[in-house]
Amino acid sequence: MLSRSGLRGARLRVVSLTSQRRLLNHFITHPPEPIPPPPPPAPSSSPSPKQFTLAVKDNIATTIPGLPTTCASGILSKSYVSPIEATIITQLRARGAVITGKTNLDEFGMGSHSIYSHYGPVSQDTPPETSAGGSSGGSAVAVANGEVELALGTDTGGSVRLPAAYTGIIGYKPSYGMISRYGVIPYANSLDTVGFLSKQINPLKELIIGERGLWKEHDSNDPTSLTTAARKRCAAQRRGYRSRQGQTTELEGLKFGIPLEYNIAELDPEIRDAWAAAAKRLQDAGARIVPVSLPTTKHALAAYYVIAPAEASSNLAKYDGVRYGARDAEGASDASAGGVLYASTRGKGFGEEVKRRILLGSYTLSSEAMDNYFIKAQRVRRLVRRDFNRVFALENPLQERETFELSDLPEEVEMEDKWGPEEVDFLLCPTAPTLAPKLKGVMEQQPVDAYMNDVFTVPASLAGLPAISVPMKVATEGAAGLQLIGQYWDDARLLDVADAVAKEVRT
């Protein structure tokens, strides 16, 4: 955390890092001086919060002069200043956040490598010209380079966890509905979640489950923010964050599930070996490792890439040069024919990947495709959620526990307990199927092939579950992530256990 002298040091660091930022391209906007938190509204006997440096993904709205919100898109110019401030920005500034800038991303959060940006791709420093992951690649690089203590990202299908894995840091996606999305430019409303990136888990624990924990705060501006009554019900079913969960740091007695379906053919052998080694280390530390089955996993990625583009096509319809978006002058001068203004503005303002997903989403919502694609994808989503509920020992506090027959499970599933599937505390799997690829290779890759990077992160997003990526050791140079997934609203215990797991698997 920053003192006054630390704030002066942060100012000097901003200046010294300018050339590096140009090289790595991880910031879109960075003011000449860090922006300190606002002064308290009135004299108070309570001490001022400790300050910390914060980078903000540029699809999270800020009203601070000099910090426009661009979403890394040509359709929103750097002159656009949001009329509203995101709730999470207000909350963190009240807790001492010193904002150092807005970070680069895939346009509107659509991508897995932070290459689909109007301002150019994001690159890692070590190794050079390597993908930083996406879509929160800029935030991840800012943390990995030590420029900030904490960075904000958004996680729709893995956009915080994947960059964390590629850059060797912590990436945390809270339970859906815990953190307000108000002021976050939407990609897919039912999936978008504000996420956090850091080198340490303790700052995340302090923010989420500390004395002023964000888990307590309902935001009436966000219809997806869990109500105060629902938060109390969730906490009561978990027997209280601090009394039961917040104290558990030892691994002994915990049961981790290894999803059989995650051992896919596309999994890099080096990642597979690191996954097995991590499981062995946890077992040596007293944890129990058991196989579990999530049979709908094989359909999760396809369902995600139907649901998310469908929601995106609706959300981005307002960027037409009239209500939102920079109007194309050429199209405006020749707007006699119907739709010319819209077509010109959207055609020139949106990047190729965004246009690809808008077209895909518009088709799946059409009358001829709705039943075959969108409705079926929603059914898959319910099955994914059911699979998770079956394997976790804790119940989902927002759903009734479901009973089922053993005949529902595939014949090939092996179970230690023939009375039913193993019930586990957490699931353990890789965050990404490969190490971070070179940017050149990514840019030469077919766009649809890059969607495979989300195969391990998408299921938790579809179910709205908390998940965290921690660095794990691999045989060669490079970074890899180990993902822990918890039951809904089990965030406090997930953060505590992830802290213990990270210490075991980091070296």
Curated annotation (Swiss-Prot):
Chief location of this protein?
Answer: mitochondrion
GO MF, any single term: glutaminyl-tRNA synthase (glutamine-hydrolyzing) activity
E.C. designation(s): 6.3.5.7
PROSITE patterns the record matches: AMIDASES
Q: Where does the record place the catalytic residues?
A: 57, 135, 159
Question: Which GO CC terms are listed, alphabetically?
Answer: glutamyl-tRNA(Gln) amidotransferase complex; mitochondrion
Keyword annotations for this protein, in alphabetical order, are:
ATP-binding, Ligase, Mitochondrion, Nucleotide-binding, Protein biosynthesis
Q: Which residues form a coiled coil?
A: none
- Which intervals carry biased composition (Pro residues)? 31-46
Query: Which EC class is the enzyme in?
Result: ligase
Q: Tell me, which GO biological process terms does this entry list?
A: glutaminyl-tRNAGln biosynthesis via transamidation; mitochondrial translation
According to UniProt, the reaction catalysed is: L-glutamyl-tRNA(Gln) + L-glutamine + ATP + H2O = L-glutaminyl-tRNA(Gln) + L-glutamate + ADP + phosphate + H(+)
On whether Ligase is a keyword of this UniProt record, the answer is yes
SUPFAM superfamilies this protein is in?
Amidase signature (AS) enzymes
Q: Could you tell me which residues belong to the region Disordered?
A: 29-51
> Where does it reside?
Mitochondrion
* Homology family: Belongs to the amidase family. GatA subfamily.
Described by its record, this protein's role is as follows: Allows the formation of correctly charged Gln-tRNA(Gln) through the transamidation of misacylated Glu-tRNA(Gln) in the mitochondria. The reaction takes place in the presence of glutamine and ATP through an activated gamma-phospho-Glu-tRNA(Gln).
Q: What is known about its subunit structure? A: Subunit of the heterotrimeric GatCAB amidotransferase (AdT) complex, composed of A, B and C subunits.
Tell me which PANTHER family the record gives: GLUTAMYL-TRNA(GLN) AMIDOTRANSFERASE SUBUNIT A, MITOCHONDRIAL, TRANSAMIDASE
What protein name applies here? Glutamyl-tRNA(Gln) amidotransferase subunit A, mitochondrial
